[in-house]
Amino acid sequence: MSECLMFGMDCEARCMTSMTADEENICFLVGTNNIKNDKNQVNKLFMDPEASRLMSKTFRHPAGEVRAIAAHPTKSTILATCTADFSSLGGTHSITIWNIEEDKRTLETVSRLPTEQVMSCLEWEPNSMKCAAMTPFRPEIQLLNMENGPEIVQNLKIPLENEEDEMFSATWSPHHDGNMLGVTGGRTAWCIDCRTDNEYLKIRDAHIHRTISMDFNPNLQHVIATCGDDGYVRIWDTRSTSSALTSLHPHAHWVWSVRFHPVHDQLLLTGGSDASVVLSCAQSVSSEQQIEFRDDEEEEEDDDLVEKLQDGQLERIDEHEDSVYACAWSSADPWTFASLSYDGRMIVSNVSRKHKYALMQL
């Protein structure tokens, strides 16, 4: 494992996103959720020019707790948050678009949409001004027009198996022009066609207890990954879902987040309640399943020896001391990833040189 960079925030935090609009600098946004409203903030974390330490710019979040955060796909000064303010009886909740005032170190409200319940998920579609938002307590996804709003333009109904089941996550497919949404709730994973509000795919009992998160393979449109509180990550072929293509068991407790590498889809990044971040390989079911690589000539007596990257755990980071709720790949450097634990600890790591060279066949 390569050396990690660490940064500690003043408050608890469980939501993080990469700044997709900044393709030159490694940069992430983190929102805190402290019960004391005046302490909550949005942190912009980035590398110093020598990439030797993490730097932070802090912006007070005046709307209370940050329950979800999304970065604008093309404008680095715009972000959106799902907010929760419990300073009054019953609390107030909203989805708010902010403009980052770098010089003033403030967040300027662009527009705000009050919501009846606290929203726990907010996903900006990469190629449009559309967002998906959800609450854990209602079986539906709200599609929002972020250009004139946030403004609700569509409600997608999710057919939960049991009324008491919670909704967990929503993820946009990169293959369907912003028309396909991956959703998890209860023990089930769905792919929903936003044009018809119809269920395109349903994987019942994807995990034993709860199916918490999912992601789409960036290179194979028929392959998805799910994770759950059974500690497993499962990879599925959406054309035949009677059984998973493969199952990995990288965590000893709940897995909160799973993310495919943006280029090399055999790499999977996960974070879990066992305070660990794991980089796994699923070479056998990837688009690059025939990849082979040469070991460094200085380390191998026979430079013609060719090996394959094997399925299973590649790297494990145990530098967190609390549940890891979020992990993300950098938009500027595909070999860099970040993880966030509930105690506010942010760790930025790199794929080790050994595995990087293996994937690049160097």
Swiss-Prot record:
Q: What is its main location?
A: cytoplasm
Keyword Transferase among UniProt keywords: no
Please, which domain of life does this record's source organism belong to? Eukaryota
Q: Reply yes or no: does the keyword Repeat apply.
A: yes
Q: Could you tell me where this protein is found in the cell?
A: Cytoplasm
Q: Which GO terms describe its cellular component?
A: cytoplasm
What tissues has this protein been observed in?
Answer: Expressed in the hypodermis and the pharynx.
Keyword annotations: Cytoplasm, Repeat, WD repeat
Disrupted gene: resulting phenotype?
A: Defective egg-laying and slow, but coordinated locomotion when stimulated. Reduced levels of both unprocessed and processed luminal and transmembrane cargo in the motor neuron axons of the dorsal nerve cord. Double knockout with either rab-2, rund-1 or vps-50 results in reduced levels of both unprocessed and processed luminal and transmembrane cargo in the motor neuron axons of the dorsal nerve cord.
Q: Which InterPro entries match?
A: EIPR1, WD40/YVTN_repeat-like_dom_sf, WD40_repeat_CS, WD40_repeat_dom_sf, WD40_rpt
WD repeat segments run: 61-108, 206-246, 250-290, 319-359
- Cleaved signal peptide residues: none
The UniProt entry's GO biological process terms, in alphabetical order, are: positive regulation of dense core granule transport; positive regulation of egg-laying behavior; positive regulation of locomotion involved in locomotory behavior; protein ubiquitination
What does the UniProt record say this protein does?
Answer: Plays a role in the trafficking of cargo to dense-core vesicles, probably through association with the endosome-associated recycling protein (EARP) complex. Important for neuronal function.
PANTHER family, sorted: EARP AND GARP COMPLEX-INTERACTING PROTEIN 1, WD-REPEAT PROTEIN
Q: Which family does it belong to?
A: Belongs to the WD repeat EIPR1 family.
Report the protein name in the record.
Answer: EARP-interacting protein 1
Native species of this protein?
Answer: Caenorhabditis elegans
Lineage of producing organism: Eukaryota, Metazoa, Ecdysozoa, Nematoda, Chromadorea
Q: From the UniProt record, report the name of the gene that encodes this protein.
A: eipr-1
